[in-house]
Amino acid sequence: MYVSQQLRRLHILLVDNDTHIRDKVQQALGNGFILRSARSLDEAWHALEEYSPDVLICEMLLPDAGGVDLCRLVRRSPALQHVPIMILTTLSTLQDKIAGFEAGADDYVVKPFDARHLIARIRLLSRIKRLEYDRG
């Protein structure tokens, strides 16, 4: 079972209103991941109602709300609270990071990002989620 989970392509939901960033993340992830994207909190919530991704990646600055708002919504949802959340943003102050973690984010990556680092962080979040699930 562990091997099949390792070989399965991870499902990622990326929430960012910047087309350039969405394209860059798609290019960075390549074929090893299934990427779905949303441009706003509203689009993200509709996507999350349809499926539960392996990892949710969101920008702090969204056109209709903040990434912290999305984090809070996900953490309050019994169906989604298990989904690991990574914030991927240009906001880099300690206060921004603390706000993200307090809202429920599991990881915080500052743009610009290195593709290998992003992939490593996504895989780590997925592995932690899997270990928590296996422990019951």
Regions found by a protein language model. Give the residues of each.
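The feature encodes the CheY-like receiver
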Residues: R22, L62-P63, Q81, T93, ...
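C-terminal output helix
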Residues: F113-S126
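Non-catalytic signal-transmission and effector/linker regions of two-component phosphorelay proteins
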Residues: M1-L13, N17, S126-K129, Y133-G136
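Two-component/phosphorelay signaling modules centered on CheY-like receiver
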Residues: D18-S37
